[in-house]
Amino acid sequence: MRIQNITDMIGNTPLVRVNDKVKYYAKIEGSNLFGSVKDRAARYLMENAYNDGIIKNDTVIIESSSGNFGIALAGMCKIKGNSFICVVDPNITEVNRKIIELLGAEIIIASKTDENGNYVQDRIQIVRDYITEHENVYWTNQYENQYVWKAYFSLGEELCNELEQIDYVFVAVSTCGTLAGASWKIKEQFPDCKIIAVDIAGSQIFERSKKKKHISGIGTGFVPQNLTHAKYDDYMIINEMDAVSECNNLLSKGIVVGASSGA
């Protein structure tokens, strides 16, 4: 396959059957350019924000992310030539930190936790303070930016084109952007499809748990505005150890995933 633009390596990911007994499929979003479903949002956001005149070549981009969206934005900013500041947790994985830095981003580390041990509120406050104190800075705000959740229309459309019938879709949630965008397109074509949001124990999105969350990439410490756009039927809370166990199960099938996919 010949690629004219490197960002064309985002989207149109493989759909793999992972269970012989039932028709159970996994969308392999790790095959995207920077390795995750968040590549869709980073690309869509940057391209549309440029087209709409919201950001220019000299605009500094800032975001709160210790994971895949930070990596994806760092990559897109590298391609576009924008400076990028990524506000992260102190417990960010060494691999993620090195990738973000390798792609040219500046990293700011949060230090204050909320009552449940989460750093997300401090990360967001750091971003708010920065954009107040500096000019020509754009906060991509993955928790409520319409560019983020609308980016996942493409994911929903791909699933609808690849499958003749969809009965259930399970979507891991954090910013709830993937859930919102994909659910819109799936419900358009398959209105009877049950869409299930999958959260992790210790997250605050659906239940006010006082349990500390240890796994990154799924769940968060508040209810993102993106959730208001989601067309989901139910949610389920997954134990962290069960998520890890399912990662190992998928690994036995040759599919390497993180905890959000395991959940």
Q: What annotation goes with each model-predicted range?
A:
Residues 1-263:
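PLP-dependent amino-acid enzyme catalytic core
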